């Protein structure tokens, strides 16, 4: 058995709750205050912290500057805006260039999740109870997304590969996703200098919604059964929780943007990126991560996301939003025995 494992953030709470003796609490062993707080919360169960945050899932709006220029727009037009304004700008881009503004796999509820976290809410309430049909933010997210699809502002790609292709071929003007999508964006060298990144739209009708969110990411965990647990913790303290040199090394090679906040002030993170026309994009994203609202994904996050994906499909096919969310809530409650 390994001493340290890497786990997806959205699965952490479920696995910790299911196997409470399998993982070593890291409270008092690692200074978790040095990490983006929203990431620390993903691994917190019953008041104890079990995860050391690693790669960043902070979202950004990534845009083709040449396409925007055709529409008479600049990346600055998309910074600190609402989703309603995003739709207005999408109409301009569509009218002037014929291209959708963004895309997303048609079987994915990632857009909904991004919007939800920006408002600091999720599919479960603070007590872990299913919170779908009466969730005002979720209703608004469904309305916004279905409107973007209906108006051709968001292209529903057939699958993940098709989604990536829309970005890399220039079929759309950009994408909104976790910062790990940079790896797919920069895989087309001839597009260097034609990209920019700004923050994520917020929900106008939700005062608590901000221009920052997350999608994806993972964290390190130490197995409680490890015979070298102290050594494992010491290793993490000297690397992912204590070494700007480490982050400086892995960033250029893998594009893995950390959530250890001190790394954001290193020269490598603050280096202007040619692919993004000189923008200090990594530094900007670390700044976004520090402002992401905290949410608790809960034990049954995957069950909820699957139900929401089905509800989204039904809504796009014409079903009433409330009815679709009612069905989703009933499905989740049945699955988890609530």
Where are these regions (language model features)?
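C-terminal lobe and pocket-closing loops
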Residues: 15, 181-192, 204-307
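Short helix-initiation/N-cap motifs at beta->coil->alpha
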Residues: 81-87, 155-169
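Alpha-to-beta junction loops
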Residues: 1-7, 21-22, 98-99, 169-178
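Extracytoplasmic/periplasmic solute-binding protein
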Residues: 48-54, 59, 69, 84-131, ...
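Conserved N-terminal structural module of periplasmic/extracytoplasmic solute-binding proteins
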Residues: 1-13, 31, 75, 204-207, ...
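Beta->alpha turn/N-cap motifs
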Residues: 6-11, 160, 177-182, 218
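Hinge/lid segment of periplasmic solute-binding proteins
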Residues: 8-60, 85-87, 114, 196-199, ...
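Glycine-centered hinge/linker elements that transmit conformational signals in sensory
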Residues: 87-92, 128-157, 200
